[in-house]
Amino acid sequence: MKLITTLLLCSGLLLTLTQGEEAQEIDCNDEAVFQAVDFSLKQFNPGVKSGNQYMLHRVIEGTKTDGSPTFYSFKYLIKEGNCSAQSGLAWQDCDFKDAEEAATGECTATVGKRENEFFIVTQTCKIAPSKAPILKAYFPCIGCVHAISTDSPDLEPVLKHSIEHFNNNTDHSHLFTLRKVKSAHRQVVAGLNFDITYTIVQTNCSKERFPSLHGDCVALPNGDDGECRGNLFMDINNKIANFSQSCTLYSGDDLVEALPKPCPGCPRDIPVDSPELKEVLGHSIAQLNAENDHPFYYKIDTVKKATSQVVAGTKYVIEFIARETKCSKESNTELAEDCEIKHLGQSLDCNANVYMRPWENKVVPTVKCQALDMTEMARRPPGFSPFRSVTVQETKEGRTVSPPYIAREQEERDAETEQGPTHGHGWLHEKQIKANKNHRGHKHGHDHGHWSPRRHGLGHGHQKPHGLGHGHQLKLDYLRHQREDGDDHTHTVGHGHGHGHGHGHGHGHGHGHGHGHGHGHGHGKHTNKDKNSVKQTTQRTESLASSSEYSTTSTQMQGRTEGPTLTPPRAQPTVTSSGFQDSDFIEDVVATTPPYDTGAHDDLIPDIHVQPDSLSFKLISDFPEATSPKCPGRPWKPASWEDPNTETTEFSDFDLLDALS
């Protein structure tokens, strides 16, 4: 039993040790990186026995590992300064030495930071004297302090003594054990001096029960931890003659039990693909199909979660999604395994409770399901369309296209006019019927076109055939609709003014609303000109109608109107839904947009004056914006010298246009 406990605790400790923060790249110009480099350089310069101090040139790469403590790993370039190593000046107070005489180097360091205090973990610098091969900065020598491997066997007695000293001289309730050796240095004197930095962690062994560490003591994942630095002197007889230690403890989370308490009657999770669930799922889907009156069988598609609990038997709780199949209950007595799921069939979200007592062959399934919401996705081709904002609303007769916005005042005005008499309907809708012989001399025009607000004309009067400047009549034929009712109703846009005389009699009525007014009386004889004009106007193209629309707006008349002013009602066209239902392909969708009441809003829209050949927006550059890289960083101090090994060539006659041509 102790062996199993030890293995479980050791595996938990191993998992804890392997879970660390990932290193992330940082900006080489970051202030925190500079502080770490400054600390490293100040630790390096005192080791220079002769010559001058070294100064920071730039940081070329760096990473950061968050945690407690935070670790910075970086590479930086150094150059020899003009201050002596024994001058006592900070390297920031020096200047670079001449390029031909200055030595350069590259340092790789790892620096930790805890509570705004830095400490060196590792640092190695390689110095290259001017015009000389790269040499190591540190040379092995007898009597010098040098780093040793953290896995060296020589450290075992030192670390053992250090841990025992900490446990015996602290008032903590639990024993601590070694977690990791971070650095170790050794110096040969009349014996050996050791300088080590290591971390410790709390174990599950209390001092009341265990006087010292033993094999059953394991580290707690959420226990207290600390960092220590020890200095030990071992004489020539390998006996510890002197020892000093300084530690900093950090409290962890609340202590947890090494092993969870057993709970035989508690629910436990089961893998959704466990073979144990095969029989349980079979009982669940059979119960669902028996209780459901759907004409087709359902089949389990996805198992989301499953638990089991030991009671007076076994209780299973399963969450799954069932989908409709192609197998009908009329042609199949039971659900077969080869029944295919219907692609557009109904889906159910189900919760099943299955109670099983195998020794009694007793199975009690209970299944509760609810239908999943099916969202109808409108089919449309990809790409941008200005009609995406037009929404489609369901009605009893079909689908109606609703504009994205309707002014409130316009809605109220339309509601009032819908109750009054009307003479027609439609947007730019034209009704034309061949003339009755008994009404050859009369022509009635009704204008109910919903034009843009500044294009509406309001008029009532007699119109004369086009000629002699007495008026003109425009007939739009690209939205023509015929209805046979015995009368000749032609929707036109007409503006007439002045007085004229002729040999016949004709009259026309034009109704519209807007800012234009038309008035006047005219008499004319209906001759073959009328027939020819009708034929000609029916053959006009859409572009001609469009150009006439704009010309009409420039000929708006002002004056007194004769007859009542009628506001045509706003009609809602109905578009029958077909196999391909998409608002992008609804014909005349532009015409479905109701007129805006700009009269009430003109004062709210400011006048924007745009200079010629100017843009009201910024163009997107053809080239990507230049982003400064994180590394290498900027030179700490602009050097007035140039590297003699680097050749610099200036191109005074280079032009970017030469490369683009």
Curated annotation (Swiss-Prot):
Which SMART domains does the entry mention? CY
Protein's UniProt name: Kininogen-1
PROSITE patterns, sorted: CYSTATIN (PS00287), CYSTATIN_KININOGEN (PS51647)
User: What keywords are assigned to this protein?
Assistant: Blood coagulation, Disulfide bond, Glycoprotein, Hemostasis, Inflammatory response, Phosphoprotein, Protease inhibitor, Repeat, Secreted, Signal, Thiol protease inhibitor, Vasoactive, Vasodilator
Low complexity biased stretches: 541-555
Q: Which SUPFAM superfamilies match?
A: Cystatin/monellin
Which residue numbers delimit the Cystatin kininogen-type domain? Answer: 28-131, 150-253, 272-375
Q: Domain of life, per the record?
A: Eukaryota
One example GO MF annotation? cysteine-type endopeptidase inhibitor activity
